[in-house]
Amino acid sequence: MKIFALHGLPTSPRLWERIQLPEGWTIDAPTCPGLGLDGTSEDWSLDYCVEQLQERANRADILVGHDMGGVIVAMMAKPGQRVVLSGTSLGAVYWAGIRMTALPLAHRFFYAKYAGKRFLRQGGLPEHADDLVDAFGDHGPGWGDRMRRIAKGMRPPNDLIERLDGCDLHLAWGRSDPWYPARIYQQLSRKTGAQLHLLDAGHFAPWEDPVGFEKALRA
């Protein structure tokens, strides 16, 4: 069984490192295009990511997407594929709010000041806070400004939920996720008919509860 898994940080591959897969299963967990050491261009976009990753996603039996990676995975999914989404939103209104954080005043608070550290420290269960910062907190120089460029480019298609029609859709969610709380996964489950798996985790469910996440992959 081949898994394609995508997060939305330069440290993306580490999100999946604690998951113990069944024998014979493999995982392809690339860094999201434009988030590597080569930097993030001012015109970075979700469509660019899809162009770079679609061929690899087509070879997978299971597509797994977390946060921004969930949006990109939903854009690439084909009918018949199993799709597992975690800690994300497919709604246009949510991402319109994220684009607002790229504006000058908001950018200084969200990105220039904290550079994602607050998102990490307050996103997981309290006992995981320090370990999450250690695992995911170093994104290289200029990360605050790169986050602004990414936020500006978060323009998913309006029919994102409809694109998952015909997929075997599962939601593997941290029950204590503060950034994508219950109303988001409940609405997504209701609109898509997805099977919901609630895990003992905050936002970073694949890393915080790898055993529960692995069970969701096999469900």
Regions found by a protein language model. Give the residues of each.
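Conserved HGGG/HGGXW glycine-rich cap/lid loop of the alpha/beta-hydrolase fold
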Residues: 1-39
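The conserved beta1-alpha1 loop
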Residues: 4-8, 66, 173
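Active-site loop/oxyanion-hole signature of alpha/beta-hydrolase fold enzymes
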Residues: 28-62
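Gly/Ala-rich beta-loop-alpha elbow adjacent to hydrolase catalytic centers
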Residues: 65-69, 73
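Flexible "cap/lid" loop of the alpha/beta hydrolase fold
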Residues: 82-110
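Conserved alpha/beta-hydrolase catalytic His-Asp/Glu region
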Residues: 112-164
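Conserved serine/cysteine hydrolase catalytic core
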Residues: 149-187, 200
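Catalytic histidine-centered segment of alpha/beta-hydrolase-like enzymes
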Residues: 201-214
